[in-house]
Swiss-Prot record:
Gene Ontology MF terms in the entry: 3'-5' DNA helicase activity; ATP binding; ATP hydrolysis activity; DNA binding
UniProt keyword list: ATP-binding, Coiled coil, Cytoplasm, DNA-binding, Helicase, Hydrolase, Nucleotide-binding
Assembly: Interacts with the RNA polymerase core.
Occurrences of domain UvrD-like helicase ATP-binding (ranges): 212-610
Protein name: DNA helicase IV
Recorded family membership: Belongs to the helicase family. UvrD subfamily.
EC supergroup of this enzyme: hydrolase
Species of origin: Bacillus subtilis (strain 168)
C-alpha cells in the first residue's frame, strides 16, 4: 500500500467515525424531540384544564393571569426547544451527506504538535463534548483554510492574533459519507473542487457553496471593520453568494446580539428573492428580511398613488424612444437620479422654513372648519429657529385644540338632532350606561330629556370628528403633492435644470392622473421626510444592497438616510447598469458615500460561465480586459443569423431541442423588453413548449422560459439564447450593457440569434471566439 492509499484509508476511516458520532447525536435528538413533541401536544390539549380561571375579584383575577402566563411560558419554552432540536437534526442530516470539505494542520507558535482542523458546514463535538470533530466554516480558525496556503499563517480571535504555521492543506469531496476525491493543495481552493462544483446544472434555487469560497470572497464575508463595504464584481464573480455567506457569518459571529430581523437585503426583484431564499436556511440560519425598493415605495405611497415600477420605467425608455415626451422624460429621469437634485430639494426645504408651505383646508360635511391660509399663518407665526418638523408637530397640536373647540360648537347643529333620531336601541343603551357611570341621574330621573340629548350629541359629533383628528395626527393637512410640484417652479435655487419647466409640466401631468413616476418616488419621499421629520430606522444593523448599479445615486443616498445606524454592504457591476437613470447618467455605485469612510473590493475572476463564454462576453466591453475567466471549458458560443422572425423562432426551437437532449434543465430565451417577450412567446409556442416570464412576481421554475433581460439579472441558466441581437435592437452604449447582462446569465452554453445586421457589440467580438451557424 503506497502513502496515498494509506492516507485515503485513514481519511475514510475518520469519516466513518464521524458518521457514527453523528448518528448517535441524531438518535438522541430524535428521541428527545419526540418526547418534547408529545409534551407540547399534551400541554396544548390540557392548557385550560391546568389553569385555574377565576375573575370574581381583583386578587383572584391576578392569580388567574399569573397562572395563564406560567402555563404559556412553559408551552413556549417547550416549543422553542423543539424548534432548536429540529434545526440541529436538519444540520446533522446535511453533515451526514458530507461531514466536511477541508482539513488544515496548524502548529500554533510555541506548540510542538500540529492540530488537525476539519472544516464543514456546521460544527460537531465529540461524545464527551470536549473536542471539535468538525469546525464551522465561520469559526475564526477556519479562516486559515480560505486565506492561506501552507506556510506562515494567522487568524484573529477577539482581542488577539494567533500566529503559527500551516503544514498541510487538504480538500475533500465526500458524497453520502463516502470519500470521492482528496487532494493536497498549495492554492486557496483547488481548481479540481471548483471544476466539480461549477460543472453542475443550474437550479431554480441558488446553491450554497461554502467549500469553494475564494480568498477575495472570504475577505468580504469576514469584514467587520468597514462601516460601508463596496464590492464591484464582474458578472458571475460570486458577489451575491459572498453577500449571503456574509449574512450567515454575521449571524454566527454575533449570535445573541444580532438576529435575522436586524439584517435587510434590498434585491432587484421578487424573482431574485425566490432564487436566493434557500441559501441561509441551508447554512442553518433564518432568512434575513428581504425587500425590493419598489416594495418600500408601495408600502409608503401605494395607497395614495399608482406607483410606476423600475421595470415599467425601463420598458418605457426602451419602447417609446420616438414619443414626443421621451427627451423630456429622459432628461427628468437623469436629473432626478443625481445628488444635485437632492441638493436642489435641500435648498427648497430650507426656503420653506420662511415661506412657501402649502396646506389643505380642513373640511367637515362640506364646510371649511379651518382654512389652509389659517394653518399657514399659524405655522409661520412659530419661531423660525425651530425646525420644520418641530413646527409641524406644534401646528398639529394647535389644530387638535381648535378641532376640540369646534367639536363642542358642532353639537348644537341640526344634523346632529337628525342623526340622533336614526340611532338604534344599542346606541341608546350605550348612552344610558355612560350616564349611569357619570352618576348624572338615576333610573328614576332618566326622563331628563335634555341631558340625554346632550350626551347623544357629544357621542355623535365625537365619532364624526374622529377621522379628522386622526388625519391631523398623521399630518394629512400638509399638501405634500403640491409642495413637490412647487419645487419645479424655480424654488430650488442654483441646482436647477435647463429643461426644468418641461420636466415640471410632465411631472404635473403624471400627478394629475394620480400616477407616481418611478424617478419621482425617492425624491418625493425624501422631501416629505425632511418636512414631516419621519423617524429613522435604528433597529436595522446591517443593510445589504445587491445589484447596486440599478439604484440611482439619489436612491442610494435616500436608503442611507432611512437606515443611518446600519453598516452597509453594497454589491454591483457597472457593466450591468441597465436601468433608465444610467442611459445618460452617473453609473458609479459610490457617489453618495464620499463623505463616509468606505472600503472597496474588486472581484475580477468570474466563475459562473465557461471560459469560452467569458472570453466572448468580455470582448463586448470596452474595459473588459481585466475580467478573468475560471478555466472551465465548454462549447464555443454560437452566433446565428436568421431571415426574419419566422426563421428566428424555428431556429430557436431547434436549438432548444438540442440543448434539452444534452440535459440542460434551465434554458432562457432572453429578450430586450417585455413587449418583445410577449411577441417571441406567441411565435415560439407554435414550435416548442416555452414559459413566458414578463412580470417580476412570477416564480422561477425549471424548463424553457422567455424573459426580459431586466428580470433575468442576478439569475443564472444552463443555457441562454439571446433573441434578435440585431443592430436595430442593440446599438447604443446602454444597449451594450443590456446585451452583456443577457449573455452573462449563461453557465454552459450561449447562443446569440439575430435578424438583418448583427449588433456592433457582437461583430466587435473576434471571430475566433465563437462559431457561426446560418
Amino acid at each position: 500500500m503506497n502513502q496515498q492509499d494509506k492516507e485515503w484509508k485513514e481519511e475514510q476511516s475518520r469519516i466513518d467515525e464521524v458518521l457514527k458520532e453523528l448518528e448517535k447525536k441524531e438518535r438522541f435528538l430524535e428521541t428527545s424531540a419526540g418526547g418534547l413533541k408529545h409534551d407540547i401536544i399534551g400541554l396544548r390539549k390540557s392548557f385550560w384544564e391546568d389553569v385555574k380561571v377565576n375573575f370574581d375579584d381583583a386578587h383572584e383575577a391576578i392569580e388567574t393571569m399569573a397562572s395563564i402566563k406560567q402555563q404559556a411560558e412553559l408551552l413556549s419554552d417547550r416549543e422553542h426547544n423543539h424548534r432548536r432540536m429540529d434545526q440541529q437534526l436538519k444540520r446533522i442530516h446535511q453533515l451526514k451527506k458530507s461531514p466536511y470539505f477541508g482539513r488544515i494542520d496548524f502548529i500554533e507558535n510555541g506548540e510542538e504538535q500540529a492540530e488537525r482542523i476539519y472544516i464543514g458546514l456546521a460544527s460537531c463535538l465529540d461524545e464527551k463534548e470536549e473536542h471539535f470533530l468538525i469546525y464551522d466554516w465561520r469559526a475564526p480558525i477556519s479562516s486559515l483554510y480560505y486565506n492561506y496556503s501552507p506556510g506562515k499563517a494567522e487568524y484573529e480571535v477577539p482581542g488577539e492574533t494567533i500566529e503559527g504555521e500551516m503544514v498541510l492543506k487538504r480538500q475533500f469531496m465526500i458524497k453520502n459519507g463516502t470519500l470521492k476525491a482528496m487532494f493536497n493543495t498549495d492554492m486557496t481552493i483547488g481548481d479540481e473542487m471548483l471544476q466539480e462544483v461549477l460543472s453542475h446544472h443550474s437550479d431554480t434555487q441558488m446553491k450554497n457553496i461554502v467549500s469553494t469560497i475564494q480568498k477575495e470572497q472570504n475577505q468580504i464575508i469576514r469584514n467587520e471593520k468597514s462601516k460601508i463595504l463596496i464590492v464591484q464584481g464582474a458578472a458571475g464573480s460570486g458577489k451575491t453568494s459572498a453577500a449571503l455567506q456574509r449574512v450567515a457569518y454575521l449571524l454566527y459571529r454575533h449570535r445573541g446580539v444580532i438576529d435575522a430581523g436586524q439584517i435587510v437585503l434590498f434585491s432587484p426583484n421578487f424573482l431574485f428573492n425566490s432564487y436566493v431564499s434557500s441559501v441561509l436556511p441551508e447554512l442553518g440560519e433564518e432568512n434575513m428580511e428581504q425587500a425590493t425598493f419598489q416594495e418600500y415605495i408601495e408600502h409608503r405611497l401605494g395607497r395614495k398613488f399608482k406607483c410606476e415600477s423600475p421595470f415599467d420605467q425601463l420598458e418605457y425608455c426602451l419602447t417609446e424612444t420616438k414619443g414626443g415626451d421621451f427627451p423630456t422624460r429622459l432628461a427628468g429621469i437623469t436629473w432626478k437620479a443625481g445628488l444635485s437634485f437632492q441638493q436642489f430639494i435641500n435648498e427648497y426645504v430650507t426656503r420653506l422654513s420662511s415661506e412657501g408651505m402649502i396646506f389643505k383646508n380642513i373640511i367637515f360635511r362640506g364646510q371649511k372648519l379651518i382654512t389652509k391660509e389659517q394653518i399657514q399663518s399659524y405655522f409661520y407665526s412659530l419661531d423660525q429657529n425651530h425646525s420644520i418638523p418641530n413646527r409641524m408637530e406644534q401646528t398639529a397640536k394647535w389644530l387638535l385644540s381648535e378641532l376640540n373647540k369646534l367639536e363642542k360648537k358642532e353639537r348644537r347643529k341640526d344634523w346632529v338632532v337628525h342623526e340622533a333620531e336614526l340611532l338604534d336601541k344599542e346606541d341608546y343603551l350605550d348612552v344610558y350606561k355612560k350616564l349611569q357611570e357619570r352618576k348624572r341621574f338615576s333610573e328614576s330621573t332618566f326622563n331628563d330629556y335634555q341631558r340625554e340629548q346632550q350626551l347623544l350629541a357629544a357621542i355623535i359629533v365625537k365619532k364624526a370628528f374622529k377621522p379628522l383628528k386622526q388625519a391631523v395626527r398623521l399630518l394629512a393637512f400638509l399638501d405634500v403633492t403640491q409642495l413637490y410640484l412647487q419645487l419645479f417652479s424655480g424654488w430650488g435655487g442654483k441646482f436647477q435644470h435647463e429643461k426644468m419647466d418641461a420636466i415640471g409640466e410632465l411631472t404635473r401631468s403624471a400627478f394629475t392622473d394620480n400616477k407616481l413616476l418611478y424617478e419621482d418616488a425617492a425624491p418625493f419621499l425624501y422631501m416629505q421626510d425632511l418636512i414631516e421629520g419621519r423617524k429613522k430606522n435604528t433597529k436595522i444593523k446591517h443593510l445589504f444592497i445587491d445589484e447596486a448599479q440599478d439604484y440611482s445615486p439619489f436612491q442610494m443616498a435616500y436608503m442611507r438616510s432611512i437606515f443611518p445606524a446600519a453598516s452597509m454592504t453594497v454589491l454591483g457591476d457597472i457593466n450591468q447598469s441597465i436601468y433608465a437613470h444610467t442611459i445618460n447618467g452617473d453609473q458609479r455605485m459610490d457617489a453618495c458615500f464620499e463623505d463616509e469612510p468606505a472600503e472597496y473590493v474588486r472581484l475580477k475572476r468570474t466563475y459562473r460561465s465557461t471560459r469560452q463564454i467569458v472570453e466572448f462576453t468580455k470582448a463586448m466591453l470596452q474595459d473588459g480586459a481585466d475580467i478573468e475567466p475560471f478555466n472551465r471549458s465548454g462549447e464555443m458560443p454560437l452566433v446565428v443569423k436568421t431571415e426574419g422572425h419566422e426563421s428566428l423562432c424555428q431556429k430557436l426551437a431547434q436549438e432548444i431541442g438540442r440543448l434539452k437532449k444534452k440535459g440542460h434543465e434551465t434554458i432562457a430565451v432572453i429578450c430586450k423588453t417585455a413587449h418583445q417577450c410577449i411577441q417571441a412567446h406567441a411565435h415560439m409556442s407554435e414550435y416548442t413548449d416555452v414559459r413566458l416570464i414578463h412580470k417580476e412576481n412570477q416564480p422561477f421554475q425549471k424548463g424553457v422560459c422567455v424573459i426580459p433581460v431586466y428580470l433575468a439579472k442576478g439569475i443564472e441558466f444552463d443555457a441562454v439564447l439571446v433573441y434578435d441581437a440585431s443592430e436595430e435592437h442593440y446599438h447604443t452604449e446602454h444597449d451594450r450593457r443590456l446585451l452583456y447582462t443577457a449573455c452573462t446569465r449563461a453557465m454552459h452554453m450561449l447562443a446569440v440569434f439575430y435578424t438583418g445586421e448583427a449588433s456592433p457589440f457582437v461583430t466587435a467580438v473576434p471571430p475566433h471566439l465563437y462559431q457561426i451557424a446560418e
